[in-house]
């Protein structure tokens, strides 16, 4: 075989592979996919293939490995649009472009209500009434579907504490208060 034949064969193979990676795959509608912590590339590719996000799970796996993206894949809930290429899917998974859910704490609500909301999100949670802080700021908080109730409560506590500290540090210093 001549060098020219090998070269053109390589170019054709490269074009074919590029077509598989960058060609848009049409899906009927928006599709949600949940990638759980600890899922490996095989499980992720199977999930994407079963939801018809990628046409061929093997090509997806090959692309992820060849582009050294396997360790960069994030977990969470992803929303895929109607038309995706394997490249687009990989980019979304490595960028961590996840869907955030919202938990709203209304002013004047009880700790018990927050605890019930957290138990609805994570039924396996071992949180109890005393775990919920008395200092929670009424607000809307974001969380991911893969977050545990304990992590969500920790984030709410941190945001509430940071907000309270900010308000305290910006208060009128002449007001005779010693602490929050």
Please place each PLM-identified region on the residue numbering.
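Conserved catalytic or metal-liganding residues and their short signature motifs at active sites
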Residues: 1-180
């Amino acid at each position: 075989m001549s060098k020219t034949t090998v070269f053109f064969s390589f170019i054709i193979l490269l074009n074919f592979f590029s077509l598989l990676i960058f060609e848009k795959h049409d899906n009927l509608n928006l599709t949600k996919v949940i990638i759980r912590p600890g899922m490996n590339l095989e499980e992720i590719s199977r999930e994407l293939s079963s939801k018809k996000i990628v046409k061929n799970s093997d090509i997806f796996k090959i692309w992820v490995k060849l582009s050294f993206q396997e360790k960069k894949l994030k977990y969470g809930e992803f929303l895929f649009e109607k038309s995706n290429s394997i490249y687009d899917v990989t980019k979304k998974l490595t960028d961590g472009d996840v869907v955030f859910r919202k938990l709203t704490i209304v002013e004047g609500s009880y700790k018990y209500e927050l605890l019930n909301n957290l138990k609805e999100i994570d039924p396996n949670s071992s949180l109890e009434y005393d775990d919920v802080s008395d200092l929670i700021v009424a607000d809307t908080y974001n969380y991911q579907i893969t977050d545990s109730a304990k992590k969500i409560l920790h984030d709410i506590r941190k945001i509430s504490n940071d907000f309270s500290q900010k308000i305290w540090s910006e208060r009128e210093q002449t007001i005779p208060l010693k602490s929050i």
